[in-house]
Amino acid sequence: MFRKRNLVLDLLRRCYIETLIPRGLWSRTISTFPKSALLATDNAEMASKETGMFSLAGELASLVEESSSHVDDDSKPRSRMELKRSLELRLKKRVKEQCINGKFSDLLKKVIARPETLRDAYDCIRLNSNVSITERNGSVAFDSIAEELSSGVFDVASNTFSIVARDKTKEVLVLPSVALKVVQEAIRIVLEVVFSPHFSKISHSCRSGRGRASALKYINNNISRSDWCFTLSLNKKLDVSVFENLLSVMEEKVEDSSLSILLRSMFEARVLNLEFGGFPKGHGLPQEGVLSRVLMNIYLDRFDHEFYRISMRHEALGLDSKTDEDSPGSKLRSWFRRQAGEQGLKSTTEQDVALRVYCCRFMDEIYFSVSGPKKVASDIRSEAIGFLRNSLHLDITDETDPSPCEATSGLRVLGTLVRKNVRESPTVKAVHKLKEKVRLFALQKEEAWTLGTVRIGKKWLGHGLKKVKESEIKGLADSNSTLSQISCHRKAGMETDHWYKILLRIWMEDVLRTSADRSEEFVLSKHVVEPTVPQELRDAFYKFQNAAAAYVSSETANLEALLPCPQSHDRPVFFGDVVAPTNAIGRRLYRYGLITAKGYARSNSMLILLDTAQIIDWYSGLVRRWVIWYEGCSNFDEIKALIDNQIRMSCIRTLAAKYRIHENEIEKRLDLELSTIPSAEDIEQEIQHEKLDSPAFDRDEHLTYGLSNSGLCLLSLARLVSESRPCNCFVIGCSMAAPAVYTLHAMERQKFPGWKTGFSVCIPSSLNGRRIGLCKQHLKDLYIGQISLQAVDFGAWR
C-alpha cells in the first residue's frame, strides 16, 4: 500500500515540476527554500520510509500550498474595469453601514463627504479616461471638497461653466468642473448601491450584467412569440415637477436632507443634464450628465412596477372565466409563477394561455410586444401612455398604433431593426434553392446573349463608319448608294466622324420614338442585331427566358405541391431577427466624406493632416465598433462588404491623398503601415481573442457604460503645439503634454430615437468647432473606443 502511495506522490511531483518549468517557476521554487528546510524535508522523507509512516494528504496539501503561492505571486495585473469594480465595492461597504431598518441616512456627511470616497470616485473617472490610478495627481483638493460638503458650503454654481453655440440657435450647454464631476461620481455610486438592487428585471440599464446586448437578446426572443409590437419614445427635459417627483421617490429609501439640498443646487445650476429623449443614452455624449443614468432609472422604476400591474390585469385578471385561484390551471397562479421564474412548473393548461405581455426598457427607450388580440395591445399602450403622462409628467412623441409583428418590415429598437421572420421548412428551403439556381442560370444566359449581340453591334458600327469613309473616296464611292444621295445635306468642312454621329442620331430618333431605354447596349442589341438573328434562334432564347421567369415568380405553395409528401399541416416556426441599419450607415458614410453619392470610396479631406497611424486608428475604430455591435445581426455579411469594399479603400485613398501618390503605389511605399489597415476577419478574430483573454468585468455594460456604445467622432488638426503656445491633454486625470490641438466637428444630430451607425449621432451644436488638446495615446483611445467624449474636460481653456 505504501509503495502505491509513493508512486502516486512521485507522479504528482513530476506533473507539478512539468507545470512549473515552462513558466520559469521551478528555479524560483527551489531558491525560495532555505537549505536547512530542504535538508529537513529529505530527512523527514527518509524517516517516514524507515518507519513506514507516510501522510499522502499532507504531501498533497503542501504541493497545493506551494503552487497557490506562486500563482498569486505571478498573477496578471487587473484590468481597469476590475479596478473600477473593486473601487465601487469599497464604496458599497461604506454605504451599507448607513442602512438602518431598510433606510439609508446621512449618506452625504458620512460617506460622500469623505476624502477617501472622493478619491475613489476620482479614480473611477480616471479609469474611464484610461489613465493609470497609480499616478497621483494633485489637481483635485479632496480634503477641502470634503470639508465644504460636510459644512454645506460647497458652491455648485462656481464649479460649472457654460458653452454657447456659435450658430443661430445659441444653445447653451452647462458642464461641471472636475471637482464637481468627482462629487457627482461619488453620488452616482452611492445611489446605485441604494436603488439598483430594487430595480425591475425589465430594466436593462444601470444593472450589472444588463445592457444593450441583453435588451436586444430579450426582444429577439420574445418578438417571435408576439403578435403586436410598439415602442414608446419619451421626450421631456428635467423641470420642477419632474425633479420634485424624483426627490419624493428618493426619499422613500434615503433620509438625507443635505443630499437633497445638494441635488437641488445642481438642478438650479442646470448641471444635472438629465433629459428624457432628445439623444440616445449610453453613447458617451458630453450632454449626458454623470447622474443621468441613475436618476433616470430611479424615476422610471415607478413605470417598471406599473407595468407589472398592467401585465397582471390583462394576463391574470382578464375576462376569462377560469380565474379561480384554487384551480390547478389558474391564470393568476401561472402569472405569479412566471414572475418568480418557475418556468419548469408550467402545466399544459398554463402553456396554452394565449395572452402574454412583454416589455423591455433601456434607459428612456421602451419596447412592448403582445401575444393576443390588437384591442389588448391598444389598451396596454393607452394605459402605459396614461401613466407616463399623468403620474410621471413625461411627454410621448410617437403616437403610432401597435403594428403586427409579421406584416411590419421591422421595428427600430436601440438603433437597430428588429423583425419577426418565418423559419422555412426543409422543403421550402429546397424549393427556394432550386428557384435561385434557375434564376442565376437564366441571368447568366441573358448576360451572354446581350454581350454577344453588343459585340456584333459594335462591329456593325465599325462597318458603317468604314462605308462612310469609302463614300468620300472617288474611286470607291457609289453614286447610286444612299450615302451619296444624302451627302448633299453635309456641311462643307464637316469631319467624317461628326457626319457619322449626325446620321446615327437621326436614325436613333426615328427608331427609338417609343423606347425609354436609349443606352448604347440596348440600341445595338435590340434594334440592330436581334432583327437580323435567325427567327428560330431568337424564339428559342425568349422561350427559355419566359419559362425561367415563370418558374421563378411562381408561388412556393404551388411548387410544394410538386414535391413528394408535402408537410402543409405543420405550423410555421417564427424567430426574431436583428438587422443592422445598412441604409442609414451608407448615408452617414456619405455625410462623413468616406464615399461618393454613387457609393464609391473616396478620401477624407479632414483626416489628411493627421499622422498615418492616426488615420488608420480612425478607420480601425469604425470597423471595431461595427464588428462588436453587429456581429450577431443577420445581415452581418453586408457590414463585412462595407468594410472590405468601402472603408478599407477609403483609408487607402486618404493615405494616397496625404502623400500625393497613386493608390496603386501606396502599398509599395507603406507596406508595413498598410498591413495594419483593418479587415472584417482580422478585427473579428482580434475581438474574439480579447473576449477569451479579458475578464468578464471588461464586458459588463454596467461598468463600461458610456464606453462600449460610444460612437466615432471626427477631429481635424487645428495646429501644432509650440513652446510659445503650450497645451496639456484635455482628458481628465492626464498630465501629458498634447503635441497638437484638434477641432471637433458635429457632423449630425439625429432625432430621438436614432440609428446606431458607428458615429457620434448627436454631438451638441455648442461643441461644434470646439478645440481640444489630446496626447497621442488618448487620441488613439478616442478613435478606437477606449474612451468617450465624456472623458474630455472642455473647460480646460476657459
Curated annotation (Swiss-Prot):
Its EC number is 3.1.-.-. GO terms for molecular function: DNA binding; endonuclease activity; RNA-directed DNA polymerase activity; zinc ion binding. InterPro entries: Domain_X. A zinc finger (THAP-type) spans 729-778. It comes from the Eukaryota. Keywords: Chloroplast, DNA-binding, Endonuclease, Hydrolase, Intron homing, Metal-binding, Mitochondrion, Nuclease, Plastid, Transit peptide, Zinc, Zinc-finger. One of its GO terms (cellular component) is mitochondrion. Residues 1-16 form a transit peptide. Pfam families: Intron_maturas2 (PF01348). Residues 578-665 are annotated as: Intron maturase type-2. One of its GO terms (biological process) is mitochondrial RNA modification. Disruption phenotype: Altered mitochondrial morphology. Impaired seed germination (e.g. many dark and wrinkled seeds in siliques), seedling establishment and development (e.g. abnormal primary root elongation and vegetative growth). Defects in the processing and maturation of various mitochondrial NAD1 introns. Modified respiration phenotypes associated with complex I defects. Seed-specific deficiency in the regulation of carbohydrate metabolism. Small plants requiring sucrose-supplemented medium to survive. Belongs to the plant nuclear intron maturase (nMat) family. Nuclear-encoded maturase required for splicing of group-II introns in mitochondria. Involved in NAD1 pre-mRNA processing and maturation of introns 1, 3 and 4. Necessary for mitochondrial biogenesis during early developmental stages. Essential for respiratory holocomplex I biogenesis in mitochondria. This is Nuclear intron maturase 4, mitochondrial. It comes from Arabidopsis thaliana (Mouse-ear cress). The lineage of its organism: Eukaryota, Viridiplantae, Streptophyta, Embryophyta, Tracheophyta.
